Amino acid sequence: PYARKAGDYVLRNATGYKLPRKLKVAFSATPEDTACATVNDMGFIGGIHEGRPMFRLWLAGGMGGQSALGLPYDAWVEPTEILYYIEAMIRLFMAEGDYENKGRARTRFIPRRMGVDAFMECYKKHLREVRESCSFEGIEPEIFKEASWDSEADHPWMIPQKQKDLYTVVLHPLCGQLFIEDGEKILKMISEIPAAEIRLSMDEELYVRNLSKAQAEALLEAMEERMMMTKVRMSVSCIGTPTCQVGVNQSQALCRAIERAVAAADMDETRLPRIYISGCPNSCARHPVAALGFSGCRIKAGDESIEAFECHIGGKVGMDTSVMAKKAGVIPAEKIPGMIVELGEKLSEEKKSYTEAAADGTAEAVIKKYCQ
C-alpha cells in the first residue's frame, strides 16, 4: 500500500510544488531491488529490522546525464512515516535544486555541489521541519498470514505466489511491443478467472497473477510461440526513433536484429544476459546499471554519419550491491547482432555464465573486437 499512498499524496499536492525538474520515488519489496530504488531520486527497499518490517532509504540517485547511485540514509524508516520523508525530499529539492541549468536540475547534482555530509544534514533539517509542520495519517499495512507451501512450478516463467496453489506467469513480447491479437488472446484466456489480474513490470513484461497451476501451464503453452522465453530475447528497448522526438537511433530495430541473429545462429542462448538498449544517452532503458547495455550515438564512416551504440558492461542493481556499468567502447549498430552471437558462442565454449565472463574480462575481450 505504500507506493500507492505515496503516489496519491504527490499527485494530490502536485499543483503546490514548483520543482526544478522531475523527482522519482521508487519502492522495492526485496533486496533484488527490481524497481531500482538505489538509483532514483528517492528509493525505499523493504527489509526486517529488529524483527519488524521497515524500509531502507536511498536519496539523490538517478540515471541520465552523469548518472549516480543513491546515497544510503543512515537510519531505518517506519513504513507508516514514509510521507514525512517524501515531503522532506520535495522541500529540499525546491530549496536547493538548480532552476537555471536544466542539465543539472536533478537531485543527484545537489550532493555534488554541497558535499554528501552537508546534503544529508540539509535533508535531516527539512525532515525535522516537516515533522513539526505536518501531520500525516498512518498507512494501514497489508499483512500476509498464509503459511509457506511446496510449489510445483516447472517452467522458468511460472512463479509460485505466496498464496497457496497460485502462480504468476511472466510474458514478454518482443521489444515490449504487445500485438493487439496477442493481448486479446491473453484477455480471453483469463477473463473467466475472477481473481486474475495483469501487472506490468519495468522490464516490459506482463505478470499474469492468481492462476492455478493448470491455468498457468495453459497460458504459457498458448503464448509460447508469441512471447520471448530466454533472457537475451527478453531484452529491453526504449521506443527510440522515429517515435521519440529526442532519440538518436532506432533502438527497437537493434533489439529485433539481435533476436533474429540469435535465432538464426541456432546456438545455446541461455548463457546470454538480458540486454538494455537506449536509443540515446538518456537512460529510458536503464543502460547505466545494465550487465550489458547500449546507448545510441552517431559516428563518422567516411563522409557519412551512421548509427552506433556505446556499450556498457558490468552494471548491477541490488540493496547495497548496486554498481554503475563501465563504458567498453562504441560499436556500429550493424555489427552488434554479430557481436552478441560471438559472445554467446564464447560463453558456451568456455562454459561460463555472462556474469563470470564480465568479471574475468572474457566478455570485454569479445566486445572490444567490434569497437571503433
Task: Describe the residue ranges of each PLM region.
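Small-residue-enriched alpha-helical segments and adjacent helix-cap loops
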Residues: 1-54, 84, 172-304
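Non-catalytic interaction/regulatory segments
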Residues: 7, 23-26, 136, 140, ...
